[in-house]
């Protein structure tokens, strides 16, 4: 495929910058746009696992990722009264094996953005409309600007606006796994030292984690609920929903809820998967969570984003045209996506226990997780491009 192709990439999180790196590497002309005024800093910890580690090494970022990795030394399980039940040390609590690594989301975004400093990147650029033609796509931005591109690739996340513009409701389905997640920063008032402490009971999980910055910690909530619509988008309702589910739940729950309004990085979402037969239509493609999020519970969203970006760019490099490249992208990535989405469903059904786990029960569950995860994280053989 001619490498002079002008390609618009939408979304400056994980998949978007990774895709731009590979497109630029292969001689294409990518432009990256992001609707927000900057990349999001900080955030929760994410993982590079399985073959995604190989992609990171090929990109030359693996050493940088390792240098910025989290450094949790233990995970402590407590009961509702705050009594220590047991603790795990090293990588065991994070389900990482071999050269797999955990890093804060914002740190990985910074590393990826540093690989594409020579690529045009525009912030505060939201898309108003996309119009496909035989030989190009016309993009109307909300700031009034209009541009034509040979291809458009959207990496704008689970709630992708591009997906809603381009694909009909018959083309995709958001599968709610019946769980919800929330994360926000708090002062490290428990003075945790490279440690995560958590309470898992009544199909709910509350955690406090402090890693590199000893003054700061992150509060985490995960829970099952059938009493909410799939889509709660306003922050006030999200916080009310958390209070309904965690007030007087035990341990530090009430304290964390009281600190919630002071956080400037509050995050909440339903745990969902994007289910699609194909991630392409005409001259437009989806990559990462926009097309195939496996759910945060799987811990594989970042890995799917990196692998998906690698394969999509590689197929565009080797194919005769975008039609052939998109067809191969859909075909090659499908088994990997399906394996990791199945893993995400299994986790949603197997975690968030009714009663606090014993050390033996946690050990048994961890071993099962590691076995299933190893298969899912290697459910594709990386092509060489």
Swiss-Prot record:
Inhibited by anhydrotetracycline. Signal peptide: none annotated. It is an enzyme of class 1 (oxidoreductase). Transmembrane segments: none annotated. Keywords: Antibiotic resistance, FAD, Flavoprotein, NADP, Nucleotide-binding, Oxidoreductase. FAD binds at residues 12-15, 34-36, 44-47, 105, 267, 289, 296-302. InterPro entries: FAD-bd (IPR002938), FAD/NAD-bd_sf (IPR036188), FAD_aromatic-hydroxylase (IPR051704). Its cofactor is FAD. Consists of an N-terminal FAD-binding domain with a Rossman fold, a substrate-binding domain and a C-terminal helix that bridges the 2 domains close to the antibiotic-binding site. This last helix is flexible, is not found in TetX of Bacteroides species, and may contribute to their different substrate specificities. Belongs to the aromatic-ring hydroxylase family. Isolated from an agricultural soil sample. An FAD-requiring monooxygenase active on tetracycline antibiotic and some of its derivatives, which leads to their inactivation. Expression in E.coli confers high resistance to oxytetracycline, slightly less resistance to tetracycline, moderate resistance to minocycline but no resistance to tigecycline. Degrades tetracycline and oxytetracycline; the reaction requires NADPH. Degrades and confers resistance to chlortetracycline. This is Flavin-dependent monooxygenase. It comes from Unknown prokaryotic organism. The gene is tet(55).
């Amino acid at each position: 495929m001619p490498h002079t192709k002008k390609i618009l990439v939408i979304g400056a999180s994980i998949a978007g910058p990774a895709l731009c790196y590979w497109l630029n590497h292969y001689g294409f002309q990518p432009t990256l746009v992001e609707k927000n005024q900057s990349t999001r800093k900080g955030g929760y910890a994410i993982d590079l696992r399985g073959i995604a580690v190989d992609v990171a090494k090929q990109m030359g970022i693996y050493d940088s990722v390792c240098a910025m990795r989290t450094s949790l030394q233990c995970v402590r399980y407590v009961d509702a009264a705050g009594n220590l039940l047991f603790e795990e040390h090293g990588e065991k609590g994070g389900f990482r094996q071999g050269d797999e690594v955990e890093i804060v989301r914002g740190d990985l975004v910074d590393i990826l953005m540093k690989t594409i400093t020579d690529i045009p990147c525009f912030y505060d650029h939201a898309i108003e409309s996309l119009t496909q033609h035989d030989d190009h796509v016309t993009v109307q931005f909300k700031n009034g600007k209009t541009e034509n591109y040979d291809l458009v690739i959207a990496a704008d996340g689970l709630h992708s606006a591009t997906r809603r513009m381009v694909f009909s409701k018959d083309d995709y389905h958001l599968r709610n796994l019946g769980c919800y997640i929330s994360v926000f920063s708090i002062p490290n008032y428990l003075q945790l030292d490279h440690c995560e402490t958590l309470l898992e009971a009544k199909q709910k999980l509350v955690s406090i984690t402090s890693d590199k910055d000893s003054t700061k910690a992150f509060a985490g909530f995960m829970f099952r609920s059938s009493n909410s619509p799939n889509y709660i988008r306003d922050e006030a309702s999200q916080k009310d929903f958390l209070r309904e589910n965690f007030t007087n739940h035990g341990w530090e729950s009430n304290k964390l809820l009281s600190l919630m309004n002071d956080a400037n990085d509050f995050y909440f979402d339903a745990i969902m998967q994007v289910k699609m037969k194909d991630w392409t239509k005409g001259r437009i493609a989806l990559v990462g969570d926009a097309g195939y999020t496996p759910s945060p519970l799987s811990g594989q969203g970042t890995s799917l984003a990196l692998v998906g970006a690698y394969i999509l760019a590689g197929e565009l490099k080797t194919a005769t045209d975008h039609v052939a490249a998109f067809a191969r992208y859909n075909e090659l990535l499908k088994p990997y996506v399906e394996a990791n989405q199945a893993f995400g469903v299994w986790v949603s059904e197997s975690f968030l226990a009714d009663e606090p786990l014993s050390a033996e029960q946690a050990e048994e569950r961890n071993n099962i997780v590691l076995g299933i995860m190893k298969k899912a994280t290697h459910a594709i053989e990386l092509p060489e491009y």
